Each structure stands twice: as C-alpha cells, then as structure tokens.
Amino acid sequence: MTYELPKLPYTYDALEPNFDKETMEIHYTKHHNTYVTKLNEAVAGHPELASKSAEELVTNLDSVPEDIRGAVRNHGGGHANHTLFWSILSPNGGGAPTGNLKAAIESEFGTFDEFKEKFNAAAAARFGSGWAWLVVNDGKLEIVSTANQDSPLSDGKTPVLGLDVWEHAYYLKFQNRRPEYIETFWNVINWDEANKRFDAAK
C-alpha cells in the first residue's frame, strides 16, 4: 500500500477563528505530508508490510523489521495521529459529548468539566513535543499523553480524542500560549466522530 494524506473534511479556513487557516494549511500540507512521505520511504522494499495500515503498523511495532522500526514508530505514528486529529475536528464542533461517551466520561471522571480539567492538565504538562489523548484501555476511559509521535495504539490503547501539542500545531497563532490553544480545542471537537470511535473501541 502507498500511504496517502487523508482528504480533509473541511477547508483550511473552516476552523477560524479558533484554529487559523495558515497553521492548518502548513500543518496538513507540510508536517503531515512529510510523515506520509517518510513512512512510504521506510516501508519501501518490505512487501510483507504492504497490506498494513499505519495504525496496524504502530499497534504491532514488534512485527516491523528492526532496521525501520524507529522510522515507522515516528512517521507511522505521525500519520496515524494526524489522521485521527483531522477527523475529530469540525467547524460545527464544540459543545459537550452525548450518548455513550458522555455517560462513560461522567462515570470515569465525575463531570464533563472535571474531565476537561484533567485533559487540559495532561496536554499542558507534556514536556516538549507530543500529544494528549482520551483512550479506551480494557474497556475504560483513560487520559494519557505521549511523547513526539508515539501512538497510544503501541500500548494497546485505542484513541478516542487526540490533541497535538507540538509547537507546529499552534505557534503561528498562539506563540507560547499553549494553555490558550488547549482551551480553544474544545470549540472545534467533533463529538459525533469521538462517539463513533468510542463505540467501536469498547
């Protein structure tokens, strides 16, 4: 398989004024595209990997040949992480979760506001580059963060929501104000997509 950028379900300016057009365009066409290019380069010459998605590769890193494992971890993770990220954003997003995900969040974290507080703290505390995640682990919700482009899938956890806290995701608009960027994220979350991911992961 040749890995490709997923088609964005909205235009670069659709998330304004929350996420700016320039950042979205650079993030997608430069950063994500580089992960796709480098992943394709890494797996070239390994036909045994040709049928595997990026998600499958990072879920089973031990099955990836050792000489390309680091590249697949970084670039396969970058491709899988960003593919999820674009899908859980929406110009019609925001508000609060509904359905099974709402019930599970309240069961695990108390209230939606308490969940937000814990998620924000995980995203703000991630030193350097990485991600904050809401994941399903053994049927229960957890908040975790990962370094660089590491994926929760590599730890057997299924992501429901993910927030990119690499500086490339926010610096043009928010500069060093990561907490402001994190708070803005809640205005553009596609809860319908998050609900689907949660239901599929249970």
Curated annotation (Swiss-Prot):
Signal sequence extent: none
Record's keyword terms, sorted: Manganese, Metal-binding, Oxidoreductase
Annotated S-S bridges: none
GO cellular component, as recorded: cytoplasm
Cofactor: Mn(2+)
Chemical reaction(s) catalysed: 2 superoxide + 2 H(+) = H2O2 + O2
Chain sites annotated for binding Mn(2+): 27, 82, 164, 168
Superkingdom of source: Bacteria
InterPro entries (UniProt xref): Mn/Fe_SOD, Mn/Fe_SOD_BS, Mn/Fe_SOD_C, Mn/Fe_SOD_N, Mn/Fe_SOD_N_sf, SOD_C_sf
Pfam (any one): Sod_Fe_C
GO BP field: removal of superoxide radicals
PROSITE patterns the UniProt entry points to: SOD_MN (PS00088)
GO molecular function: metal ion binding; superoxide dismutase activity
Cofactor binding description: Binds 1 Mn(2+) ion per subunit.
Catalytic class of the enzyme: oxidoreductase
Enzyme Commission number, as recorded: 1.15.1.1
Protein family according to the UniProt entry: Belongs to the iron/manganese superoxide dismutase family.
Subunit: Homodimer.
Purpose: Destroys superoxide anion radicals which are normally produced within the cells and which are toxic to biological systems.
Protein name per UniProt: Superoxide dismutase [Mn]
Native species: Listeria monocytogenes serovar 1/2a (strain ATCC BAA-679 / EGD-e)
Phylogenetic classification of the source organism: Bacteria, Bacillati, Bacillota, Bacilli, Bacillales
Gene responsible for this protein: sodA
